Amino acid sequence: MAIILAITNSKGGVGKTTTCANLGAALSAAGKAVLLVDNDPQGDLTKVMRSDPKSLKYTLANLMNAVLDDTEPELFVNRAVIEGAGIHYIPANSKLAGVSSRLVSANEQPLPRRRDRRYSL
């Protein structure tokens, strides 16, 4: 069974990215399948994973927009998930800020519950 952890805090500079990256690395080293999701428009976790947020064509924003548009997010998953240093991750960039505003203005409708069970985190 997959375990889902969210590392959150509304304050910046408290170690969310560092904690997430190090926890992911430790779990990967222990043989666990790890999927990290960068949910920050600044793309700090994406940078830690050695990707340039500005150069990425497919990111978390594509996946979230697909869900909001009721299209198939599966079309973007294989393109958005990147493998780096033995860890899979979904990158983020400034396009995620636009998704945030869409979420705020969206009707209160339940989103479909889809989950890929290949990952431990």
Predicted features and spans:
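P-loop NTP-binding core
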Residues: 1-121
